Amino acid sequence: MDQSGVLLWVKAEPFLVGALQEPPPSKFSLHYLRKIATYVRTRATEGAYPHLYWPTWRHIACGKLQLAKDLAWLYFEMFDNLSVRTPEERLEWSEILSNCATEEEVEKQRSQLYVDTLQFLLFLYIQQLNRISLRTSLIGEEWPSRRSRPQSPSPAERPSCHNKNWNDYSHQAFVCNHLSELLELLLDPEQLTASFHSTHSSLLSRDAVTALSFLIEGTVSRAKKVYPLHQLALWQPLHVASGFSKSSKTFSLYKLEAWLRASLTTNPFGPSACLKSGKKLAWAHQVEGSTKRAKIACNAHMAPRLHRIVVMSQVYKQTLAKSSETLVGAHVRAHRCSESFIYLLSPLRSMTIEKCRNSTFVLGPVETTLHLHDCENLKVIAVCHRLSISSTTSCTFHIMTPSRPLILSGNQTVTFAPFHTHYPMLEDHMARTGLATVPNYWDNPMVVCKEGSVTSLFRLLPPSEFYIFVIPFEMEGDTAEIPGGLPSAYQKALAQREESIHIWQKTVKEARLTKEQRKQFQALVENKFYEWLVSTGHRQQLDSLVPTPAAS
């Protein structure tokens, strides 16, 4: 550990929501990223450096890397969504897109967007987190190279998940293993050898270290305030350790790398710390006769606002409903929940649902990504910036989203449907997360994997199977209807069904049944209704809404 008391760690968010949970394109290898890093610096006057504009990235991705345009936009927009923007700015962008009548007009608006070039290179590099194989590349260059790994956590500290995006030990190991390559990507071309490698005398610019703050942050003497890496590296007492020269205003790459390796430690606000020392939340009750005990924890009591995490596991056979300040702006993970109805009615930063079965999730607006993995027979209802799914079976998604839903690998029997519910604070929460009702791409998913035909991977819910979802809780707020309304085909189906009910009621009323006949008819209807409640699973939800004796 550095003698100055500085602690550095790898930021969680770039990996939680920035690393696509799918193997990256082969052209995102270090070999090609090095070429891109050199290329953009030679095109500074053409919208490539220090800011990379969408048309330039489209040219690089489609023309040189041979990526599809949709895939090029996906990575560009994913990174842009990680940038700091106000909700008002995001809503303004949604309004601009909603006013575009053609694809050409959309492209014209996108052409004005740009990202930080060096940070975007780092973003592309960390997509290797979910690389399936680390075999030697065709050009004979082993990638990623093996580096000294951080000390493995004890079994008690090790998180109970194999999801690398939610495993901060994987984040730390990835950065430590590939720190030299990350730094070399940030070097100016004249600081590299002909084979794109650094030397002992290579110098990094201040802009390069500022870009590295995308991945690394820290604190001093365990203070609660968190600083980006470049602010700590430029701090006067650390100039010798970080290798900063006042005269040249550059960093010695050799000294900076040594300082980073000496100072990097486990993220004190990451998922592992939350599981180990987070505050336990009594949001769920123990189901009688069940050996499963729900575990819910958060770090809101000790983490800065932008580092909030909530983890929940093994919620079983119950209704869990929360609208809480603890959830606001938090990264939330639900793991191994089954046969439950889970309502998280607060604006969330991100939501990950893993290994859950036979349950319904109703979520407040998700500012970044809603991701599902290895789930079966779920109904998910949410407004989100992006939905991505992998290894799901028989799941239905009622969503409102300004981005095309991503179908990654391993999915079966996926159903997409329009968002069909509301709660009183919904529109207020949407405004806080910068999510609008248009554009809405719920019915236009993007298949990222290459598994079978596109039409066999998903279906759109037929209007004849569509019903409104009612949230059975009272809250304060102004939203009294589904924001943005329903697509016309679904609205028409509801109207026809309602008309059928009116006709049926009129028929019963005009039948002039005797008192005994009415009694028999009522019993028949109640029995059929009860059978319907049981067959649809609604009986379980109604039972779980009744407070247990201990909770009442």
Curated annotation (Swiss-Prot):
GO BP annotations listed: maintenance of centrosome location; maintenance of Golgi location; regulation of cell migration; regulation of cell shape
Gene source species: Mus musculus
Main location class: cytoplasm
Family the UniProt entry places it in: Belongs to the TBCC family.
Top-level taxon in the UniProt lineage: Eukaryota
Pfam families: TBCC
Function according to Swiss-Prot or TrEMBL: Plays a role in the regulation of centrosome and Golgi apparatus positioning, with consequences on cell shape and cell migration.
Name of the molecule in the record: TBCC domain-containing protein 1
Limits of the C-CAP/cofactor C-like domain: 304-435
Coiled coil region boundaries: none
UniProt keyword terms in alphabetical order: Cytoplasm, Cytoskeleton
Annotated compartments: Cytoplasm, Cytoskeleton, Microtubule organizing center, Centrosome; Cytoplasm, Cytoskeleton, Spindle pole
Cellular component annotations (GO), alphabetically ordered: cytoplasm; spindle pole centrosome
UniProt key word Cytoplasm: yes
Tissue specificity note: Expressed in brain and testis (at protein level).
Gene3D superfamilies (UniProt xref): 2.160.20.70
